Amino acid sequence: MKILHLDTNHPTLLEQLNTAGFENHEDYTSSKVEIEKKIHNYDGIIIRSRFSIDKHFLQQASKLKFIGRVGAGLENIDCRIAKSKDIELIAAPEGNRNAVGEHTLGMLLSLFNKLNKTDKEVKKGVWLREENRGVELDGKTIGIIGYGNMGKSFAKKLRGFDIEVLCFDIKPSVGDENCKQVSLGELKEKADVLSLHAPQTARTEKMINTSFINSFTKNFWLINTARGRSVVTKDLVLGLKSGKILGAGLDVLEYEKSSFENLFSKNLMPDAFKYLITAENVLLSPHVGGWTQESKEKLAQTIVAKIKIKFSANKI
């Protein structure tokens, strides 16, 4: 089988696929149009987020048997068309779930203890203690929306705290020893913190809007290490200004065209984002929640293992 690699990844990915008997070709620079002209020669492709795999692209891929996405989400792939062509979709949420869990916890603790603000102040020679009293996590209720690989990883990281962890998921019976599954209504009633871990779907897009925010009983902190389009940023800003949202940790933004492209290619910064970058109770990172030295290798290993199980004649 011939595999076309469209993004660089950890060396172990190519090494192990070569060992397993696959023929691997690399093209990290050609345009999407140029790739479309030769994709009919390949049985598989491996991609991160270089470009979208849309209907037109898939129509050219007459031999394609699988798409390996070195990451968790598949929103940049036309999954309906791929499935209609019997193309196997292989993702690797297991590969970076630990990284996402740690990043989410790090953001939460940083917000509670105002680490972003105090770091900047001390570096400017400002020494304020009373103004920077933090908040303890113990005694709080954490609400998680989306209890798959990422949500479970975050809940596991919380085990050392004296807190209650609740989750809402459209799938039944996903709760475990780290988290109690509840209705969305109960989560909204009890949560001090809302952490998003749901994939991008029609149901989750623009889910966090003014109506949703105001339906929470308590004022709350928001953490989003999932997908930026789940949050309506202008409504988030209204929540921050009113105090309904006490602070926000955002690893993803609705303005992203895709995970790793330049956020503002036309230098048109939305007003809501201007507020976020100046707000002391907002912590931002550039979609790196699952982006660690360790996860880079784990993602590669996960993709290789799944490809071997499905397609390799030399199964290990």
Stretches with model-predicted labels:
Residues 22, 87, 179, 245, ...:
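Short, conserved active-site loop motifs that form the nucleotide-linked donor/cofactor pocket
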Residues 50, 192, 197-200, 226-227, ...:
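Short glycine-/small-residue-rich Rossmann-like dinucleotide-binding loops
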Residues 1-90, 187-189, 209-211:
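An N-terminal-biased, well-structured beta-alpha scaffold segment characteristic
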Residues 219-222, 227-316:
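Rossmann-like dinucleotide-binding domain for NAD(H)/NADP(H)
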Residues 85-87, 93-141, 153-156, 160:
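Phosphate-binding beta-alpha-beta segment of Rossmann-like dinucleotide-binding domains, i.e.
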Residues 61-66, 85-87, 163, 218-220, ...:
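A short helix->loop->beta-strand "cap" motif at the edges of active sites that frequently abuts
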Residues 1, 130-218:
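Rossmann-like dinucleotide/phosphate-binding beta-alpha-beta segment
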Residues 43-44, 66, 193, 221, ...:
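Short, Asp-centered acidic motifs that coordinate Mg2+ and/or phosphate
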